Amino acid sequence: MNTRNVLFIFFLLLTYQWVFAQRSYKIEKVDALIDYDGLLNEEVWKTTEIADSFTVNSPVFGAQSRFASEIHMFYDNNAIYIGGNLFDSNPDSVNYVLSQRDDTGNADWFGISLDPYANSVSAFAFIVTAAGVEIDGLESSDGMDESWNAVWKSAVSKTEFGWSFELRIPYSALRFPNKSIQEWNMNFWREVRRVRETSHWNPIDPQVFGSITQSGKLYGIENVVSPLRLSITPYTTGYIENSFDSDLGKQTWKRRVTGGVDLKYGLNDAFTLDMTLIPDFGQTTSDRQILNLGPFEVRYNENRPFFIEGTDLFQIGGVFYSRRIGAAPFNFSRSLENLDENEQVVNNPYAAPLINGTKVSGRTKNGLGVGFFNSIEGRTSALIVDSLGGERFVETNPLTNYNVFVLSQNMKNNSSISFVNTNVAREGGNRDANVSVGELDLFSSDGMYRIKSSLKSSAVIDEQIKRGHSFTAGLSKVSGPVQFDFGYYEESDTYDPNDLGFLYNNNERVYSASLELNDYTETKRF
């Protein structure tokens, strides 16, 4: 093979892209009562359009799934209804493994993705396993955020041909434009676990970047109104603590009662207000115990619902680490400074109390995402007692205000431009901090190439102002069998976003390059 032929083949690989016609489904409005038993026995299921002929995504893309799926949909003034018969050539082999919520485990499952704004940026995902486990989340180009939870209904049933399901998704679980005629992006997924086959109603090519951009169309929804989205949850919590007091030589009891309120309100079809007053996260999952022998702090996952629900906009730029809020007091070790020989610290709060939290987020019909987050942290003091019984208090955490502001504008071809600002303001002469981010993410018209860059600026205001910067630029080919990435990243030695962000270390320059050849065709060996 001569050089000219080699170059020609390589050029074809670079520009290769599967082309499939976008599928569509016309949904009808029907007033019908459903007996949620997972069986499609009601007459309405027999009169609606069928979505079938799923295309395999993995292990080998492009073939029609050998497991037939027949999906039906209709809607009324309150919700969208989905029912499906999922056929299996070996019904006894369907995996019905039970798992926790938001975890498919080792079970067969089916899901639907709904993008009401048809902007291919984010979508609502609803999944049910053959064992009846529900999974929901917000899908984006970064994956699926399963911390998002909604109230919806599902039922599944074993059948002689495989299994079947019924779903009811109320409009209160969705955000959609305020217009009389709706046209949404939509897709269905199915996984047959024992053979690891994943298929979709509208084909999703693994060699093309992004799954939401490869959705089908849902049309036919008309004259539906988004319901009032309002939730008020007052609560009270009591604590009883029993411990041994060495000074008194006996067991002692401590009692504490707290109370607060959570509020969630849909300002309009696009924006939601979340507020919490005197939050109590005592019921959230505890962190794993980690013995840290390294030079860097441990980055923990966020488990508090207020800080994980509806925070996708605040993750832009990578400068918001919510675990900074309500963490150890800012001057936790100050209580150990200037201790006299006859003094000891008898009480030093290990976490700063949260007074309130507020966030507003959403995206307009023109693709402008707006996010505002604010939280106030209370004061803490350590109690120091001397040998004569004298007491004094040392402030370990000042009153602190945390603020995040985000603007993100969607553009053509799933591109975007964003601005993020985080600010930490502490009372008195304590340290303040500010970080600003500008980010540009551009895709070519065919979705094959991507340019992404960001510029970050930090300012730590203490006795003096310490400024720093971070810069990133990259060019990637993100679709096709041949993919590559070239990138550059630098951080100045004074860049410090850690008052409200997380950075292991600064003062570095990184050049990177990668090349991938992805072959999804079936061979004798694979």
Segments (PLM) and residue ranges:
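Bacterial Sec-dependent N-terminal signal peptides
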Residues: M1-Y25
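Membrane-embedded beta-strand positions of outer-membrane beta-barrel proteins
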Residues: G38, P234, M275, V360, ...
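Repeated loop/turn-to-beta-strand initiation elements of outer-membrane beta-barrel proteins
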Residues: I80, F271-L273, G367-F372, R379, ...
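Transmembrane beta-strands of outer-membrane beta-barrel pores
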Residues: D88, A130, Y171, R190-V192, ...
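Outer-membrane beta-barrel channels and translocator barrels
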Residues: Y117-N119, S172, P227, N268, ...
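Extracellular loop and loop/strand-boundary signature of outer-membrane beta-barrel proteins
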Residues: S246-G249, E343-V346, L388-F393, N423-E427, ...
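Exposed, low-structure sequence patches enriched in small/polar residues
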Residues: P353-I355, S361, A433, D446-F526
